[in-house]
Amino acid sequence: MKKFSLFAILLGFNIALGACSDDDTTPVVQNEIFQLPEKAYVLAEQSRRAIVIRDAETNRNIWSWDPYTACVPAAQQGWFVNPSEVKPVFNRRYILMTASGGAVALIRLSDHKLMFYANCGQNPHSAEVLPDGNIVTAESKNGEISTFVVDTVKVLGAKANTVKLGNAHNVVWDKKRSYLYATATITGGVTALFRFKYDGNRSNPKLTNQTRIYTFDKESGGHDLFPVYGEEDKLWLTAASAVYKFDLTGVTDATTNDSAEPTCEKVYNTADIKSICNGPDGILMLKPTEEWWAEGLVNEKGEELFKMDG
């Protein structure tokens, strides 16, 4: 059995998935120019530190990447242990990934080229692209939100600046308001939503004006924070006991100094969902069946929608 985390682009859906599956023996062509299909699953194959793209129509693996064939120096290959998030960015032409061993990386799909990578800490969960092309990551072990200058000539990078945020698991950029959002665990063990401004300094990127904008009374373990399809002012949040929606309608843009809070609605009383997204055809969730991963996706009713072979 193999461990996977999976990011799916299928019928308008985007989601991270953990799955356990046997090997797929279909060969993956490495020397052709690649374009991401409209319906595809982008998987982080934790057993061999790899990323695999699987065509959702044919159920065949059509693209793969790993730090060994990419000639990552041996001393840094351990950074890519247990990929934790993989997602298409820049109009689906690149993959942005994090791995529990510490890696954050940007990979070009067309030719498998590693464009940028760095170490962002002991247990990163998520990364996001900032407006100028720099990258920000969330790392839970030390509770850090870190920025990186993306230099595709040097390729290997390092942290530029870091702010502390306990049990950081997610980062989402709000293009409309020019804020970065992330959740954290605060005193008392409850989850809170924070926002940051980005200073836009391409060569020395910093997050500023850290502000707590929503605090749960009892909820803990904030995990996945992700935009709601079809509702530009809303974000999904999965946590220890339920699934929520934040409504940011009353939050003005970063040019003001207001302290408006979002509203929050409990949507599903479903515990320990690792990832969620929605699209034209409904809702996808990852509900772990073994530790942090599962063999497939379910909908909001718990009905199986997708399952890996094996």
Per-segment meaning from a language model:
Residues F4, N14-F34:
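Bacterial Sec-dependent N-terminal signal peptides
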Residues P37-A40, N91-Y94, D132-N134, K176-S178, ...:
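Short coil/turn segments that connect the beta-strands within blades of beta-propeller domains
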Residues V42-S47, V89, L96-G101, V136-K141, ...:
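Conserved beta-strand positions in repeat-built beta-propeller and related beta-rich domains
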Residues W65-S126:
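Blade-loop segments of beta-propeller domains
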Residues A75-K87, G121-L130, L165-V172, D217-Y229, ...:
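Repeated scaffold domains used in trafficking and secretory/extracellular systems
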